[in-house]
Amino acid sequence: MEFKEDQLVKWLKLTKVPKLGPSKILKLFNLESDIERIFSLSDEQLLQTRLFNEQMILDFSQLKRASDDNFIRAIKECKENNIQVLTILSDAYPSYLKNIPYPPLTLFLKGNLELLYKNKVAVVGSRNADENAKNWTYNLSKKLVENNLVIVSGGAVGIDYAAHRGALDAKGNTICVLGSGFFRMFPEKHIELFKEIERQGLLISEHLPNFPGSTIALVQRNRITSGISNGLVMVASGEKGGAMIQTKMAFEQRIPIFYPKEELNLQPNEGVIQIKKDWAGIEIESVEDIIKKLIIRPEIRTES
């Protein structure tokens, strides 16, 4: 299902209703397949769907009455800046992403959408990783793209940067999942990196272009990073932090989790020890160790 611009405004409003998450919205569209029809339902009809309670109906009513201006402006900005909008109802939305816990309802994308259908490996780790860990990550990413795999990471300093840089320098493809909108990307010193990824890969956000980012958004984007990937490599991390939250999400999504040999002593390594002990991680010595354990999804297009 594809939306016209006025329908997309309604969709964006609908997704802002508190407690009306992906599962309920998908059920709602199974009952009422037209966004215009949903917006015309009476309070009683909304209650009869058993997807809304009285407070949600009040919230929805307020959103319907609210000005459309911010959403209209955001959609215009997307068109003017080559930002593509993909909803969970779109035929182009990857089916495997729908199956993760709490899938993103709307994706904003810049770059090569075809990479959504390629085999991908998420490479993550600490912002404070040592030089050995960053060098190992860089070389791993180069080897992975040489084997027709796409590198997925989050654009942060440390391991993320090394992962993207290795893929780009090897003339491969990489995807960056952002925790902000496209007009507010950070860290600022990576703006040129983000531009390069747009040209040679794909930028993904679930937020309107002017969203400034937040701690919660950075955590939430992790489910997309692992959700679009066939496996995840956790290079170096302490016991806590974003990389460990990301790895836990990958574990819950049941994708393979890989880690470097402990003997390499890539720092910090407390997280690697925990993965080995608690999360059935797979120790790797070579790229081949990753490739043979990846989950290959049916809709992923393989190289001929």
For the regions a protein language model found, what residue spans apply to each?
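Short, positively charged patches
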Residues: M1-N135, K142
